[in-house]
Amino acid sequence: MSEEEVHDTSSEASEVFTNQPNAFVRGVRSIFGYRKTSLTLFVILTIVVTAGLSFYDNSLELTIELPTSQLEKEILESSWLDLQNIARYPHTYGSRANDQVHDYLEEIIQDMEYDNDGEKIMFESGKGVVSYYESNNLLVRVNGSDGTLPALLLSAHYDSVPSSFGVTDDGMGVASLLGVLRFVAHNQPRRTIIFNFNNNEEFGLFGAHAFVKHPWFKQVGYFLNLEGTGAGGKAVLFRGTDYGIVKNFGGVRYPYATSIFQQGFNNHVIHSETDYKVYKEAGLRGLDLAFYKPRDKYHTGEDNIRNVSPKSLWHMMSNAIDFVQMGVVDDSEEPAVYTTFLGYFFATPISALARVNLVLLVLFPVVSTPLLFVIVKYKKWKLRVTNFLGVPLAMGLAVAVGQVGNPMLVSSHPMMVVATTTSIVVLVYYVVLNGVDWVNTSSDQKLVTMIEVSFVYWVVLVYVTWSGGDHTGEFGVTVLFFVQASTSLLGLIGWTFTRVRGGDEPLLSGEEERYGTEDERDTEKPLVEHNYDWSLQYLLIVPVSSLVVYNSGWLVLEGVNKTVQESLASEHLIYWIVVVFSQFLVLPVVPFITKFNRYIVLGLSVVAVVGVLMSMAVHPFNQGSPMKLRFIERVGQNDMVEVYGRQGFVEDVLSDLPSVKQTQAKLECEALPDGLEVCKYKSGLTPGNLTVEVTTEPRAESYGLISGAITIAAPENRMCTVHFPPDRVKAVVVGKFGNNFKAIPDGFSREKGNYIYKDRNGISQLELYKLDWNKDYHVGFEWLPDIDDEGGMRVEVECFWGDMVPAYQEVVHYSPNWVTWANKERGLVGVVKHVDV
């Protein structure tokens, strides 16, 4: 080799050596270059950060601090003691313990301006159902410094259901009201505050109905209702009447809210109701603040002091203390969209969000369509129909195969169900999209997929916007569409600057890396390995979208997953939520899914297989997440215990009861509609001293109608129901009729102390609630006789007692630890009598 050749070789080697990137550049390229290892790192970090932030945001222990000021410490200590005393025993309206709670509260407030409300009301509480109620609400008024401001109502109910100690529902609400009362006693509020410690919310919102008839109601403009439909945890802003009042919740120290639950009420996904409904229908503006999980302990003996903490109580109470200090309320009365994240509260009128949605829905198609036309026509982006088949095909298959086999498992293991379903969905997308990519390679299939996902979000956003004010919980769709469509638009803009093959590469190259091994460089496309636009696209789309979907979806699932026990319709709804949740979790990563490395695919496969196997082997209920059964004992011609629950579980539980085995009682199980069943048996543990005597009074005929009356004697009783044949009874009275039928006005009327209700369409049921334990019920009615009878009519009377009864004590004591018990009716035992009039 000549000296010149040696010199040239040395120069080339020196040039190659000096052109090698330094360690920093190599590190950046290894992390942000479009490599499987880089994508794996990004995915793992996204999962960890998303789950971590969501856990922190929803954690009571990490986000709520106990009070530090001396006054607030004393208030919390006193209110916690109040809660312990209130929830010592179940205290339903039909129990003596209810009177004890009433007297306990009255003793606390006796030095303040209060009224032991004695309203008697009568109204139509349902179709063909009329209710008569005697109230003993406790009302307290604290006058504000500015008498021109409308008063604020604070409301909570002090009754429980007969099967529960009523700690969360609604002892914590009552204890919070007492805490606020002690606070305003030391700090005069600007506006007058009226406290309604109301009774008998559980069986018809009667305490709230009674307050609406009270003279103090006329002072009230706003309200805050405190409730509980779970057992501890954080108190969430369930719903608000309008934006003007909702935005004041941003002033509390620990805001925790989502309008997703508000939409659940509006769309009748959540079936239970609170006093909020009564106050809103009466024209007030306000909020519903409530504990919301877990529902399998709701209305059971597990709603006790052991399952809550002072920190839960303080979360509700401190927010109530802050809310009562609100200033002037905005006049805006349109529905509100609201949420919180990491303690920051966001609220906007639904119309403002609708305007944003309309702009996005129009803007992105208008901008992206011309860009796509230019790219395809002038930039030689070759697209075929098969390029667009992957996402819809995978989405359809994922919906078809995504449901886990054990339908009840979501009640106790929601995370396992979601993880299994999501893993299956990811694997379906992975297989289908790689198949499409193999059949018909695109120069930028990733961007094609982004556009397809953007279109999916666009369609959903059209539906959300068109649906209007009832869909206040779907604000996340706006965020998802914005980040996805914006990133797709950036990709299209990048393509417009791409030179036709042979030119220079653009800054946002549309090229996509092809490689064999993870560290193998593509020698045919040396510039592609330094393509970093994918990392920008990933960071714009995936972290934000994943957090929005995961946090919202998990909040919804934790709030409703226990309702899978309530009916087949609820089961279908829950699994629809799971499938949609999983789909939306996966959609943000779909554009990158073909580049998942073998370790991610293997891990997802393991999760899917293990999840499916466990769903077939694991019992769906356990002590921490029990199954709820409902109990009622009916005493009459056939003394029977009735237990209601989902099909396939009730008989096994009851067959092991001592009274069933010892008496060889026959279990009679009957399938009910919607996936439920009822099992009946003769207990032999009939409660004593429960008597109901029904006597008839002479009847008279007037204008084709027959008037009759009965007297119901039920000692130590507060609750009875009179059942009439459908559509025959046209008027009822608690007392005695003073006028003939034609003289009675339609609806409710009162005459000489008698409470009358007339409905020409027919009254099938009269509910009676009284305060005097031993006073007889006097009920009159007028009915239209059938042509083929002789004017007679059979009436059924059922009276309920809420105190513990032997048969109920037995099922609680001897049932498995994965079962909890709740009442089926207004009491645990009902005595039934029939009478012909």
Swiss-Prot record:
Protein location: Vacuole membrane
Gene Ontology annotations for the cellular component aspect, listed alphabetically: vacuolar membrane
Cofactor(s) needed for function: Zn(2+)
Cofactor binding comment, as recorded: Binds 2 Zn(2+) ions per subunit.
GO biological process, one term: proteolysis
Binding-site residues, Zn(2+) 2: D169, E202, H299
Membrane-side (Vacuolar) residue stretches: 58-355, 406-415, 468-474, 561-572, 620-837
Active site: E201 (proton acceptor)
Protein's recorded name: Vacuolar membrane protease
Species the sequence originates in: Candida albicans (strain WO-1)
